[in-house]
């Protein structure tokens, strides 16, 4: 290769690196307004009952691609469940969940240990009034012990939905009106159970942090001790919330690709508020974030069509 060719090749590589760095710098800022263009996913409208609507959304500025499922749990044809893998390694793809559980809509659920086989759930997993995994009661940060009651999503058999800061004791669940007042380098002194009330749900899972509370954006990532982790950063995302009408909102945002960068927690909260939620919670994200409708993957998890196997999921079934 001649000296001129080497210089041209080096200049081209340098230009590409500069473009990538500039693009990342431009896209890493947090947006306070996210104007989405939403439309009904047409090929789902004829097969699903009136209580289930599937939408796709686009914002060119960030940019992001997103999918939302709006579910009316009062529809007698609709059932909401939190489900757990029954495979030997305790993980399945959402398509497998969809087929095994006869679910029409499935999104990924809570955090799990990817480097352990069989895997274990990170935090509460409560299915059919039975504790599969207990709540995370404390975590270590910089050799300091932080007590925590992290955000949880709960379903009741009557179709009601709740999002709360939750802990567990044996097979009993308890929720707090406010999160524990943790701050980076400043943990709460103790875990005060006297401030907790029984939480009456049939299915529940820990994830977090909470994104919205009482109709307002309130991202409690520090209180739930997610500082010192990558969770607050820009990622592909899955979130769940509910409207004042009681409708469940499930949202998946693609990320880690040129056409869809992903969102941070504040941006995710904005999207959920714009979808009409009064309460909302962040679920497991990254390569786990996916939505399957009638066995078909709608999004591109972390830029691919390969589904990550997960331990828990939220399933919408039709009677």
Predicted regions and their residues:
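Short glycine-rich loop/turn motifs
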Residues: 63-68, 150, 206-208, 235-239, ...
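Short, conserved active-site entrance elements at the starts or edges of catalytic domains
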Residues: 184-191, 199-227
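Zymogen propeptides
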Residues: 26-171
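Short, glycine-/Ser/Thr-/acidic-enriched flexible segments
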Residues: 25, 74-76, 112, 160, ...
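Conserved, well-ordered active-site substructure
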Residues: 116-141, 220-279, 288-319
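Flexible, D/E/H-enriched segments
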Residues: 29-56, 219, 296-319
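Bacterial Sec-dependent N-terminal signal peptides
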Residues: 1-32
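Structural recognition of the beta-strand scaffold that forms the well-ordered cores
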Residues: 104-108, 153-154, 162-164, 211, ...
């Amino acid at each position: 290769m001649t000296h001129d060719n080497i210089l041209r090749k080096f200049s081209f590589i340098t230009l590409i690196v500069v473009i990538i760095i500039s693009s990342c710098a431009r896209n890493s800022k947090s947006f306070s307004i996210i104007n989405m263009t939403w439309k009904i996913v047409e090929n789902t409208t004829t097969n699903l009952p009136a209580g289930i609507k599937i939408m796709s959304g686009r914002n060119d500025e960030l940019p992001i691609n997103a999918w939302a499922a709006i579910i009316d749990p009062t529809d007698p044809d609709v059932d909401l469940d939190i489900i757990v893998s029954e495979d030997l390694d305790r993980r399945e793809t959402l398509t497998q969940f969809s087929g095994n559980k006869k679910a029409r809509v499935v999104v990924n659920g809570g955090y799990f240990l990817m480097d352990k086989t069989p895997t274990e759930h990170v935090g509460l997993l409560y299915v059919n009034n039975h504790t599969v995994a207990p709540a995370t009661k404390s975590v270590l940060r910089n050799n300091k012990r932080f007590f925590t009651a992290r955000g949880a999503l709960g379903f009741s058999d009557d179709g009601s939905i709740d999002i709360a800061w939750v802990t567990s004791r044996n097979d009993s669940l308890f929720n707090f009106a406010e999160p524990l007042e943790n701050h980076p380098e400043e943990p709460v002194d103790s875990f005060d159970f006297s401030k907790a009330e029984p939480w009456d749900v049939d299915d529940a899972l820990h994830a977090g942090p909470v994104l919205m509370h009482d109709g307002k954006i309130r991202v409690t990532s520090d209180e739930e001790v997610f500082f010192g982790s990558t969770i607050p950063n820009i990622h592909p995302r899955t979130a769940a919330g509910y409207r004042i009408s009681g409708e469940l909102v499930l949202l998946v945002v693609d990320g880690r690709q040129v056409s869809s960068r992903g969102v941070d927690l504040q941006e995710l909260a904005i999207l959920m508020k714009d979808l009409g939620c009064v309460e909302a919670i962040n679920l497991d994200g990254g390569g786990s974030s996916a939505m399957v409708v009638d066995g078909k993957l709608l999004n591109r998890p972390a830029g691919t069509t390969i589904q990550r196997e997960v331990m828990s999921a939220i399933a919408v079934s039709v009677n």
